[in-house]
Amino acid sequence: MSVSALRLIRVRRLSTSGPAVKRALPWRDIRRIAKVTGAIVFGGCVFITYEVVTLNQALTIDTSAILQEKQKSYIYPTHSTNREQESLASGLTIKTRRELHKAARKFLEITSRVLHHPLDEHLSHLDADPHECALWVLLKRSRSADRAVRHLAVQELAHNHHWRDYQYQTAAQVVDQRTAVALARIPNVDLRFFLPPPPLPHTEDDISIEDGLRQLLASLPQSDVDQCVQYFTSLALRESSQSLASQRGGLWCFGGNGLPYAQSLTSTPSEKVETFCLQALVQHSKVRSHCEHIVANGGLQLLQRVYQLRRDSPKIQRNIVRIIGNLALNENLHTTIVQSGWMSVLAEMIQSPHIMQASHAARALANLDRDAVRQKYQDGVYILHPQCRTNQPIKADVLFVHGLLGAAFKTWRQKDCDVTDDEKLEGVREDYTECWPKSWLAADCPNLRILSVEYDTHLSDWNSKCPVENQRKSLAFRSQELLRKLKDAGVGERPVIWVAHSMGGLLVKKMLLDAAKDPDLSSLIKNTKGILFYSVPHHGTFMAEYSVSVRYLLFPSIEVKELCRDSPALRDLNENFLNIAKDREFKVLSFAETVPTYIGPMLKILVVPAHSADLGIGDLIQVDVDHLNICKPEKKDTFLYKRTLQFIQDALGGRRIK
């Protein structure tokens, strides 16, 4: 082959050469790559998910275990007992626990420094989150020797609602007795600040509450006590579930509260027996020496059992808290009361929407709060306002005194009225108040201290709660008893306005006459500025003339006998009081009823006529209501309440008390 021919062949090869053709991958290789990639992605997801779940389990607290320990010894977290595996997840778990333990140790070190060193020593180098530091600083200040600093710290503690749950639980264990009582008297305080009652001790042989109350009563001293205490104790020990007859009252309601046993107790016999026993314990708790016996014999724990069992019985709960309030009059028992778990109970009850419940708790807490309250509130003296700690200065006292068969709360309720079904659906009575001095007067005059007193009265010795000591029912005895209680409450240290209904007005006059003769009570007379009378029988009543028609007056009590028309005792009382009232220039306003009152079947009388309600000085205003409703305004904007409010403001100097 020639040279030219070879060149031609090479040129043709070069001209026909093009880009290299790619070789197509077979489907077998594609499936293999997909399997490997999918396995890697799926395995990675499974691994990450496993790590997240493992870490979450390691950091999650067993809340059920915490709640169980909280009931036994309050707040003690349990330790985890899971086995640790030799794996990456186990390593993360161990590392997390170590970090948590370090944080816990650091937290305890900070706590120790805060509680055991002055504030200025640790604030400069305290290593903690701001909210953690703030809590412990306030807890430290709540124990300050400076009273003003303590009170301010308690207010800041209660008003800061950003604390976390564990901080409330920690504070509940750290706060001292004084701070716990103070927190309970702050309005709307968070109840997590208070430890729950400790577990109650197991009773021997599964003893019932009824038997426990009987044993407690039997263990109390029966000698050197007045006859009423002996009577109530013997009555409670004698009655049993089988022999206790159901007590019912009639329609008679002279002072606004019905007969003592007209209030239904429920049909449960055991509950009725418990009520009798609690009434006897109330009488014993009025005796100072018996209070220590009640506590020493396990009374606080037994009352806690009854309280928890009878949460559906407001009357039983009020009697229990009434006993606690009487025990709290003894300062040496305060520590035992607090340690028995009553702070959480009282803090919850004082926030009750029911005024009677809240007022009983307010009295008990005030008697426990020796850091802010100097006065003591004896049995039967209730604080309607202010029931909590307040920064507002109190300028005057207003005292409400009920009448025959009245009560500290129900006498002063809003007027009852018939409500139609349509009105119920519209909710027109949602604003109904159980005690208008608490709901209305306190709102219009927040700088007043409003008190209401209570004492037992009876129309007939047939219905007397304690028929063995008639001298206790006279005006003279009640006057001395109430004067002593009011002095303990600090009444007379500032201007005083008296508001009385029916026989309560006679009692007020007797108290002022007795105070005028006692040098220790001279401030009460000096500071009395005005008296408001609601249908007070200054010159007696016609009630005794109906003894034939009304069976309750067949054997009238001392109270009824003292109300007889043209009674010499009433005449002397009125004349002597008029002399003092004119000399002291008391402001006086009297309301008189004009509508007859139903006091029994087919019996309707004008209980206190206008001429008997006329004291002889001051204004007399006749109102178209009956004897029961003369002290119960229908609404806040009615004449009866507006005129009452105006009188109180005018008697205190013509300025609005705000």
UniProtKB/Swiss-Prot annotation:
Pfam families: ZER1-like_2nd
Function noted in UniProt: Plays an important role in the phosphatidylglycerol remodeling that is essential for both mitochondrial function and intracellular cholesterol trafficking. May catalyze the remodeling of phosphatidylglycerol and be involved in the transacylation-acylation reaction to produce phosphatidylglycerol-36:1. May be involved in bis(monoacylglycerol)phosphate biosynthetic pathway.
Stored SUPFAM superfamilies: alpha/beta-Hydrolases, ARM repeat
UniProt record similarity statement: Belongs to the SERAC1 family.
Location in the cell: Membrane; Endoplasmic reticulum; Mitochondrion
Gene Ontology biological process terms in this record: phospholipid biosynthetic process
Name of this chain's protein: Protein SERAC1
A single GO cellular-component term on record: endoplasmic reticulum
InterPro entries: AB_hydrolase_fold, ARM-like, ARM-type_fold, SERAC1, ZER1-like_C
Keywords of the record: Endoplasmic reticulum, Lipid biosynthesis, Lipid metabolism, Membrane, Mitochondrion, Phospholipid biosynthesis, Phospholipid metabolism, Transmembrane, Transmembrane helix
Gene giving rise to this polypeptide: serac1
Membrane topology classification: Single-pass membrane protein
Residues spanning the membrane: 33-53
